[in-house]
Amino acid sequence: MEVKTLANIKSAIKRAELNVKQNEKNSAQKSAMRTAIKAFEANPSEELYRAASSSIDKAASKGLIHTNKASRDKARLATKLG
């Protein structure tokens, strides 16, 4: 995999390649979280709430979103659940 970078040092080139891979993985995880939230908002149910809550927790544990944002998002979903 070739990454276009200005780096000349071998370790910097490797880090640039890793950054691209990590960005793709993180973007996919965040997208899955957003999709789960949107699915719940479209049709609020206990099952979809659990799925959305789980995906929010996973994103927070991996450092994709702040812990406080995760708590806030889950609380907002819980109020929509009723």
Swiss-Prot record:
It comes from the Bacteria. One of its GO terms (molecular function) is small ribosomal subunit rRNA binding. Transmembrane segments: none annotated. SUPFAM superfamilies: Ribosomal protein S20 (SSF46992). GO terms for cellular component: cytosol; small ribosomal subunit. The keyword Isomerase does not apply. Pfam families: Ribosomal_S20p. InterPro entries: Ribosomal_bS20, Ribosomal_bS20_sf. Signal peptide: none annotated. One of its GO terms (biological process) is translation. Gene3D superfamilies: Ribosomal protein S20. Keywords: Ribonucleoprotein, Ribosomal protein, RNA-binding, rRNA-binding. Belongs to the bacterial ribosomal protein bS20 family. Binds directly to 16S ribosomal RNA. PANTHER family: 30S RIBOSOMAL PROTEIN S20, SMALL RIBOSOMAL SUBUNIT PROTEIN BS20C. This is Small ribosomal subunit protein bS20. It comes from Streptococcus agalactiae serotype V (strain ATCC BAA-611 / 2603 V/R).
